[in-house]
């Protein structure tokens, strides 16, 4: 696997962690934040709302090079994880989850373009599949690990793990993802 594709896949893994980690730690969060489990469940819904709202951000970012967009989006999900890690209140944690959701759709759209452009002729589909592989790995490995860390230490530790993943992903995208042309604006 090319290093650039690995960086993109780590980005989807990081997004998958951001999206799904809450499911394994929901009861710990509810207990610590002194809210009911159904109320803590809004932390899942608000992420989805962020995904929907953030999908439109590509309209505003179309003039920038895809690598810069990926760096910005990865920074945003990492910022959300930082806020979640230190959130002193349920309401700030809700805001953090919304911020974490914002880059989701735009990252996949931009990452797909970059993966195809990085691929050899006729291998674009394989490159996109490799990039998207991070998401199921987040479910398979990241969520159980995050749940274990939450139960063993604190629900904040999995978010801290997301911060570390985000920083590593930023470095890898910066170092290994090539500059590709922005898509032409057709309308």
Residue ranges and their predicted role:
Residues 96-134:
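Cytoplasmic helix-loop-helix junction between adjacent transmembrane helices
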Residues 80, 91-100:
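Paired small-residue
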Residues 54-66:
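Helix-to-loop junctions at the C-terminal end of transmembrane segments
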Residues 47-49, 136-137:
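Short hydrophobic/small-residue motifs within alpha-helical transmembrane segments
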Residues 34, 86-92:
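Helix-breaking motifs and short loop linkers at transmembrane-helix boundaries and internal kinks
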Residues 92, 130-175:
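Helix-loop-helix hairpin linking two adjacent transmembrane segments in secondary transporters
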Residues 4-40:
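Extracytoplasmic
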Residues 69-82:
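Structural signature of the two symmetry-related core transmembrane helices
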């Amino acid at each position: 696997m090319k290093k650039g594709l690995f960086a993109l896949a780590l980005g989807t893994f990081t997004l998958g962690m951001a999206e799904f980690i809450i499911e394994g730690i929901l009861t710990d969060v509810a207990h610590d934040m002194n809210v009911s489990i159904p109320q803590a469940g809004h932390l899942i819904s608000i992420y989805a709302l962020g995904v929907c709202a953030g999908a439109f951000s590509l309209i505003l970012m179309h003039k920038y090079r895809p690598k810069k967009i990926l760096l910005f989006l990865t920074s945003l999900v990492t910022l959300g994880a930082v806020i979640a890690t230190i959130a002193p209140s349920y309401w700030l944690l809700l805001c953090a989850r919304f911020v974490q959701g914002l880059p989701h759709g735009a990252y996949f759209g931009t990452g797909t373009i970059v993966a195809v452009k990085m691929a050899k002729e006729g291998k674009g589909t394989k490159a996109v599949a490799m990039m998207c592989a991070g998401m199921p790995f987040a479910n398979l490995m990241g969520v159980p690990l995050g749940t274990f860390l939450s139960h063993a230490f604190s629900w904040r530790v999995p978010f801290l793990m997301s911060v570390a993943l985000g920083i590593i992903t930023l470095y890898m995208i910066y170092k290994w993802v090539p500059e590709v042309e922005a898509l032409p604006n057709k309308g």
